[in-house]
Regions:
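Short, conserved phosphate-binding/catalytic loop or strand-edge motifs used
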Residues: 254-260
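Residues that line or immediately flank small-molecule/substrate-binding pockets and catalytic motifs
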Residues: 112, 151, 255, 328-329, ...
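Ser/Thr-centric signal marking residues that sit
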Residues: 113, 252, 505
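Short, surface-exposed recognition loops or helix-turn segments adjacent to catalytic cores
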Residues: 51, 251-253
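Bacterial Sec-dependent N-terminal signal peptides
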Residues: 1-58
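N-terminal catalytic cores of secreted or lumenal carbohydrate-active enzymes
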Residues: 75-248, 269, 279
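Substrate-binding and catalytic surfaces of secreted/luminal carbohydrate-active proteins
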Residues: 59-70, 88-92, 200-201, 232-239, ...
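A general structural signal for short secondary-structure junctions and capping/turn motifs
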Residues: 34, 55-57, 99-102, 136-141, ...
Length: 515
């Protein structure tokens, strides 16, 4: 219902030329208000304000951590002074608006590939516990809580064998024994340290006998006569994992459905993805009791997110059956693709489901541990979150010192990961990207809302979040060559930040008096 109010200046004078205005609830975005201005000339103007009319809270800085190029210690606590009254400073200011709320955050994590799990299990038990804690413990580690698991093999696996013997359409030989060796033990290790681990399931290819090219690799398409077989196969995967005490939060229809890769791959058009989700996957999942599993399309590069989402959601009943859209970072920034997709399909969830640096060796790629990788990760996450992504999932969580093991990649080599394990020496090293992710995951909790912020310099990238407990995390990337000392301004208060050149800073803010 609209409320009639008056607009006045600070000293009580009415705004010239404007008579009573009306404030309406914005039905699409509950945290926004629509204001109607009625001018004396009879012209009606409207504006959307993305804030709630709530009293301003008093906040205080609780912690600041920083990582920077050339520093041996990452996420180092740094000194700070508390907020003071805003004295009207202009220019070098970072603004944060706690009452301007956007999407809810679901989590951060990485892919528990067979490669990652194999490298994990090759370490001693004590080292495995140490590594699991470093990744998944919210107090002593990064607090990761959203991981991706392959349905079968992919290019970062030990072999290309499916869960069934060849030419078994009845799935009588179905077995996940290969996953019981490495993948499932790593998932269970993660679960021990993570409060609630969300898992995304993703297929790279159906078994060869289900495809028109007779191979798991080099693209090919799912044969029409095996559409039900493939859906049954996916259901069996979920059922077998459930027997192990592992449940999935969501799944994508297909990894990179536009790419005919030299490794495991399968091609779908946007329309075909939508049709398969609606006509086959969703009915099979519902019948088997997996009706709450969330279906996601695309799971490929950002430059085509809008078109592919539009094609899939044009399929009748697809907007009801499909929960979200996943994307990768390999084709450039394209952050506006996410914004436009959100604007067209505001109820859909956008997830950064894969990103990594690599190959690990050779060519023009930087070596392990290079700071530029951390900056690239941080810039990607800020850009995606500021355009409505609600989660980020890194690619391999662990590789060996050669970037593997891997399949079908002899010409380009392995990849990088945020942890490099050396089984021979029973050790592992945390890479710069580990800390880049940690600047978000350790301080932005599941259920947080992205909140409004703005900055003054193209070399300063920022993203801000309000946690369910009311605390706030502000992440700032200074990717420039100059040290900067901007003011952080929020709720009528300011404080000075010291941002070294090429650094990532997380500012933690709490309500005054909160523990």
């Amino acid at each position: 219902m609209a409320k009639r109010i008056s607009m006045r200046f600070k000293h009580g004078k009415h705004v010239p030329g404007i008579i009573p205005i009306f404030v309406h609830d914005n039905l699409q975005y509950p945290s926004m208000k629509t204001i109607t201005f009625i001018k004396q000339a009879g012209i009606i103007l409207t504006a959307c304000l993305g804030f709630q009319t709530v009293p301003a809270q008093n906040y205080e800085i609780s912690n600041i951590v920083q990582s920077r190029a050339g520093d041996l210690k990452m996420m180092r606590p740094v000194g700070f002074k508390q907020f003071i009254e805003d004295f009207g400073a202009e220019g070098e200011v970072i603004n944060v608006y706690p009452d301007v709320e956007y999407q809810e955050m679901l989590g951060f994590g990485g892919a528990i590939t067979e490669t990652s799990a194999y490298n994990f299990m090759k370490l001693s038990e004590s080292r495995r516990n140490e590594l699991a804690k470093a990744y998944f413990d919210a107090t002593e580690g990064l607090g990761l809580n959203f991981c991706r698991v392959s349905i079968g093999s992919n290019d970062f696996a030990l072999d290309d064998s499916p869960y069934v013997s060849n030419n078994d359409p009845k799935l009588t030989t179905f077995s996940i024994d290969r996953d019981r060796r490495y993948v499932i033990p790593m998932i269970k290790a993660a679960q021990r340290y993570c409060g609630e681990l969300y898992l995304m399931a993703t297929p790279w290819s159906p078994p060869a006998f289900m495809k028109d090219n007779g191979k798991t690799i080099n693209g090919g398409k799912l044969l029409p006569e095996h559409r039900n077989t493939w859906a049954d196969y996916i259901v069996r995967f979920l059922q077998e994992y459930k027997k192990e005490g592992i449940n999935f939060f969501c799944m994508t229809v297909q990894n990179e459905p536009k790419a005919s890769q030299k490794w495991q791959s399968c091609l779908y058009s946007g329309k075909e993805e939508g049709e398969y989700a609606v006509d086959f996957l969703k009915p099979h999942l519902d019948k088997a009791g997996f009706d709450t599993l969330k279906l996601i399309v695309w799971d490929h590069n950002k430059e085509r997110v809008l078109e592919r989402a539009s094609e899939s959601f044009a399929v009748p009943k697809a907007r009801k059956a499909i929960w979200g859209v996943a994307f990768h970072w390999y084709s450039g920034k394209h952050f506006d693709q996410l914004r436009m997709t959100h604007e067209r399909f505001p109820e859909k969830h956008l997830i950064l489901s894969e990103f990594c640096k690599g190959p690990a060796t050779g060519g023009t790629h930087v070596p392990y541990g290079d700071w530029s990788d951390a900056e690239d990760y941080c810039a990607e996450m800020i850009g995606d979150f500021n355009n409505y992504a609600c989660a980020s999932i890194d690619w391999n969580m662990i590789v060996d010192t050669k970037g593997g093991p891997c399949l079908y990649r002899d010409d380009i080599g392995g990849g990088k990961a945020s942890v490099v394990a050396d089984a021979e020496n029973n050790s592992f090293e945390l890479q710069s990207t580990y800390y880049a992710v940690g600047h978000f995951s350790k301080y932005v909790k599941r259920g947080a809302r992205r909140i409004g912020n703005s900055t003054y310099d193209d070399n300063l990238l920022t993203s801000s979040f309000k946690n369910p407990d009311g605390s706030i995390a502000v992440i700032v990337l200074n990717k420039g060559n100059n040290n900067l000392r901007p003011l952080l301004r929020m709720n009528g208060k300011i404080m000075r930040l010291n941002l070294p050149r090429h650094s990532i800073t997380t500012v933690s803010i709490k309500s005054k008096g909160a523990k």
